[in-house]
Amino acid sequence: QRQMCIRDRNQSAHGDREFGHIVTRMRKNRKVVVGHWQDEKAQGQIATWMRVCAGWADAQDMLIIRFGDQMNNVAVTDGDKVSAEQVLGYHVDYCPVNDLMKYYNAVEDKNVQAMVDTYFKEYDHAPELEKTGTEAYTKVWNSAKAEIALRRILKDTGAKAFTTNFNDLGDFDQIPGLASQRLMEEGYGFGAEGDWKTAALYRTTWFMSQGMPKGCSFLEDYTLHFDGEQSAILQAHMLEVCPLIAEAKPKLEVHRLSIGIDSETARLVFTSKQGEGVAATIVDLGNRFRLIVNKVECIKSKPLPKLPVASALWIPMPNLEVGAAAWILAGGTHHTSFSYDLTVEYWEDYAEMAGIEMVVIDENTTISEFKKELRMNEVYYMLNKALC
């Protein structure tokens, strides 16, 4: 009798095989977890899938607001917005910067003062930054005003993500970088230079990693650091890096930003934690979307006194030469959504749910094999349409 009970509880000769056959016959992508329900490994795989389900569900009504247009002469940050809504759930709306300026002009001084006080309370800063009447204080004040305006318009529209563009700032006196940093920390997706796909992907990254300890951020391949086996990529942007990845308390500073309107600009300055993570991006290849994921290791950066921005320094797996070459061959963006907590498995599940291509660059990647994979994928995704 006992043997029969054990067999009944664990037998799958008919149930999962039959169901698996039916779903395979229907050409349905899905995750298969094999293991006892009390095993930690099986529970972990299911937990990963559940987090991805939550992120996927959140994306299905995701509104991304583009304040201004794309950065000029940049193709990779744009894409087919109709296909993006059909495949990924993203709805992308354009909002003239002047509409945001109307919100900005309507912000009350008392609310700005409260926000400025919050800045000085939460972040390290030079004492002279609190001196009213100075240009630096005015920049902090205007940054607070811009943050309040952004919060209000995002709430009114129901947007979960947004983009800005330093080429399209209207009457603003500085790019709203400080506001973008703080809004990312609270879960709003952000993409610079009109990059709505990365803005949406960051929102999903943040959503899937809720309750995890290490953090995530929008990042950009800023500059290459060639140093033998320690060759790495400096990850930064003009300003917009999320404080969730900061190693220590961020410092509020005001410095000149010569990109865009060339003005003194408030920002949070910090360096990232050390440790392993994954960087992800989605690109539009014309006939499909491709998710590119690279395992990376964030290392300690030397002081960068002439680059007062938030930053991370990472070595892409398996090393800079192979990792960067593979990323370029795959058509990857210079923007990514980065997480210390998520693993490749999360993005595999996400790609399965979305029904999109995924390529992984990790410690086992070689250029010759990676090229073969890209070529085979090209054929597969053309033929796969005929099977659906």
Residue ranges and their predicted role:
Residues 92-95, 165, 212-220, 360-365:
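Flexible, glycine/charged-enriched surface loops at secondary-structure junctions
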Residues 116-211:
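Long, internal scaffold/assembly segments composed of regular secondary structure
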Residues 261-388:
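Extended hydrophobic packing segments that form well-structured cores
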Residues 7-129:
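Cap/lid and interdomain-hinge subdomains that line or gate substrate/regulatory clefts
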Residues 9-44, 171-227:
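Anion-binding alpha/beta catalytic cores of soluble intermediary-metabolism enzymes, centered on
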Residues 79-87, 178-181, 353-356:
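Short, solvent-exposed amphipathic alpha-helical segments in soluble enzyme
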Residues 187-309:
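C-terminal catalytic subdomain
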Residues 2-6:
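Short, small-residue-biased leader/transition segments that mark boundaries at the very start
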